[in-house]
Structures are given as structure tokens and as C-alpha cells.
Amino acid sequence: MAVPTFVDRVTLHVSAGRGGNGVASVHREKFKPLGGPDGGNGGPGGSVTLRVDPDVTTLLDYHHSPKRRAEHGGHGAGAHRNGAHGADLVLPVPDGTVVSDPQGHLLADLVGPGTELVVAQGGRGGLGNAALASAKRKAPGFALLGEPGDELEIVLELKVVADIGLVGFPSAGKSSLIAAISRARPKIADYPFTTLVPNLGVVSAGDTTFTVADVPGLIEGASEGRGLGHDFLRHIERCAAIVHVVDTASIEPGRNPVDDLDVIENELTRYGGLEDRPRLVALNKVDVPDGRDIAGFVVDELRQRGLRVFEVSAASGEGLRELTFAMAGIVEAARAAKPAVEATRIVLRPPSVDGSDAFTVTATPDGWRVRGEKPERWVRQTDFSNDEAVGFLADRLNRLGVETRLAEMGAEEGDAVLIGDPENAVVFDFKPGVDAAAEILSRRGEDQRFDESRPAARRRRAIEEAMADRAEGETRADVARRLDRPAREDGGAYGPQSYEIGGRDDPDWAEEDLGE
């Protein structure tokens, strides 16, 4: 199978890097107790950027490797060390590349060297526990996870940036003409559809330098997909002028140059968007006797239509100087009317769901679905293996008003609550805490609903239970034995009791006091 050398349309799957995770760490140093949290933040993931490179003329590289991924961000570390930034992935594309989504919606038109489009943003790094510390939460035992980077499919379509476009039937001599007026060396042969890909040539006429595109041959029905023209008509959309190259030497029975020009014009009209471009007509191959005669028959009719007609020969060079200077005049006028293109940087940002702070709650057969930029981002940042992190999420959702909204809409304890899009939603059981308007007595970052399962709470509860069991099993004799004192014969208990000051029951009484 032949390997393509020119590709002007590809579907590219791009993935930005994931942000690094924050870390929960406590400062430890000799003679410095209670050093406090020192967990660093995760680094942001790398982004995917398309950049116009004048040295790139095809999308062939992305045809062979259609999946591209940027680097992930590094994780945070102790001692306030932040994770490394993921390296951005820069993909060079030809000048004139159009970027769209798989549904055909235009995202950007990249024109001008250095123009950039950030198609996929890297994920933000998670915060370490040092950044989460506050007056009420002095030593968080958790950190936030890094967010995933953007991942999407885009369609790259090349529309050659040329000043002049050559159009005509197959074997009209377009490739020979561009080879004669420039240093381009396209494939030339005496059979139709020799040219299978557009050829670009740089032409100089006086002080003006411009580019000419040789489009593969058009036939009737090209705008509907016949022949090769349908795939390459896009390459003349940016041209300042269109030159009809008409073969005057090898006319088939029933055909003439005027009819050929009308067929091509009809296809350009049906393709659309080219009606306002100036037209030039190059009657080619006049070096052949029959060609010169036929050109003489049709030149007046074409000029009566208001067309500028040139009798040329790509083989001998006849008429090429006049043709190229006419092209240069049109190009100069078009450039003067068009502002200069400066390199720009475009960033694609997916639209937020109902604004950055807003959220929606919808009843579904599966439960209650919550959508919103903040709730969905908070869920992605949460480490669900850490109870304190889950409590922090519950606190944030409560403060945002999610629990209050669910209660107002009739949600009951135990109902399923789904946060996020249907494909990646996280499911919770609705367990309402305190009212959102009431004061939250637990520390921020902790949740009373999870307090009993925390390790510190379990240890405290075990000690309390052991002390209670021991107290119940001790008798007064056990207490006396533990205190190394004999049990009182009267059965009285050791410990606080009433007594007369100076009497024998006074704990400060001594035998020497009797002598006084």
C-alpha cells in the first residue's frame, strides 16, 4: 500500500497532563515540637498546544500518530516542597490549519507563523495540608488530589495559505505552469489526474513575492465529490485570486475552452464562498499551432465577459511575464486591504455549568443529580480513602448550599446523590448534617458523622471503656490494697468525708498533739 506524503485532514486525540497530588505531612525537627503541617502542593499538568510552524506543510505526522499526551505534574512533598510542573506538549501545524470538534463546530483558524492554540489545559495540582491549614484547622490530616487534564478529540484540516489558486480540468497544464513560473517541481505527465496533492510555488514579479497553489484537476460534479476536486477545493478558499488554466491544444469532440471554463465556474459557485475573488484566464499551450488558433477564436468572447485573458505557454514561456505581473497586482491590492496577521495565543476553555458558583439539582430515576463547576471540581479533588478529606468535602458542599437545596426539593436520608456528568458521576448516600444556616461546631475539615470511625476516636473510646470496666470491678478492699492501707474496720470508705478539725478524724492529727 502506498504511503501518503501529503495529508490535509486528520482526527487527533489529545490529553493534557494530570495535576500532581498534594501531600499531608507534619514538620519534624529536634527540639521543635508541634512543628505544624508542611505538606507541599502538587504541580500542574502540562497543556497541549498547537503552534503554526512555517516549515511544516502537511499533517502527515499526526496521521501516523493520532494520539498525543502531555506530561503529568509531580506530587508534592514534605518541607513545603511543591511538585514539578508537567512539560507542555507543543504540536507544530502548517499555516492555515483549521481546528474543529468532531461535530464540525469551528474552534480556531490558525493563520500566521507563531500563532498558538491551547487545545487541552493541564490539570491543577492538589493543595497540600500546609495550604489547607487555618485557625480552626491547624494540622489537617489530608491533602487534595490533583485534577485530571482536558482530554478531547479535535479535527485538523489544512487550508493551504496561497495568494493565487490555479484551477482547471485535468491535464490543462497547471503543474507545468507552476513549474515554469516558480521553482516548484511537481510531478508532470501526459495523463489525467497526475497531480494528486496540491503543489505550492513561490513566484517573484518585480518587488512582489507571492505563493501559487496548483489544485488537482476539477471535473464536472467536483463540488459533490466527483474526482479529486472535492477534497482539495478548500485549498483555494484563502486565495486572493483564481486563475483558470484552459487547455487550447487537446480539445475533445464536443468541448471548447469556453465550455470548460463555464463548467469549472459552476463547480466553484456550487462550492460557495469564492464569488468575490478576481478571475484571470490563462489560455495555455499556445505554442502548439492548433492551440494558438483556438485561443484566437475564444479570446474576444472571454474578454467581453469582463475577464482578463492571457495567451501563455508553460513550455516556451510565452506570456508568462504578463501573467505573473497581473497576479502580483491583485496580490498587492489584497494585501493592502487586509491588516497584517500577528501571532496570537488562543486558549480553549470548556464552558462552566451554569456559572462558576452556581449549581443545579435535578431529580432523576437514579436519584438526585448535582451539576456545577465547584461541586464537580471538589469531588475530583477528594481522597475518599481519608475520612477527614470526606468530611472536608461534606463541609464545602454544605456551605455551598447543596444539602439545603436537596432537603428543600424533598431528598430523604439514604437517597442516592450523583455529582458530575452521567459517565463519571460519584454516588453518595444523602446523610444531612446540621442545617446550612446553623453554626457548625466541628472543626472545618472534620465531620461529626465520621468522628466515631477516626483512629483517635477509637483509641479514646477503648480507654474510656477499659477504665469503666475496671472501676466496676474494684471493691473497697481493692482500693485499700492499691493504696497500701488497711481496710477500715467500720466499713468506712477511704476518700473525702466529713471530720472535725483537730479531732482524731482530722487527716492532720498526730499523737504529739495529745501532749498539748
Curated annotation (Swiss-Prot):
Residues 162-332 form the OBG-type G domain. GO terms for cellular component: cytoplasm. GTP binds at residues 168-175, 193-197, 214-217, 284-287, 313-315. Residues 466-516 are annotated as: Disordered. The keyword Transmembrane does not apply. Keywords: Cytoplasm, GTP-binding, Hydrolase, Magnesium, Metal-binding, Nucleotide-binding. Its EC number is 3.6.5.-. Mg(2+) binds at residues 175, 195. Residues 4-161 form the Obg domain. Residues 466-491 have a biased composition (Basic and acidic residues). Pfam families: DUF1967, GTP1_OBG, MMR_HSR1. It is an enzyme of class 3 (hydrolase). Its cofactor is Mg(2+). Belongs to the TRAFAC class OBG-HflX-like GTPase superfamily. OBG GTPase family. An essential GTPase which binds GTP, GDP and possibly (p)ppGpp with moderate affinity, with high nucleotide exchange rates and a fairly low GTP hydrolysis rate. Plays a role in control of the cell cycle, stress response, ribosome biogenesis and in those bacteria that undergo differentiation, in morphogenesis control. Monomer. This is GTPase Obg.
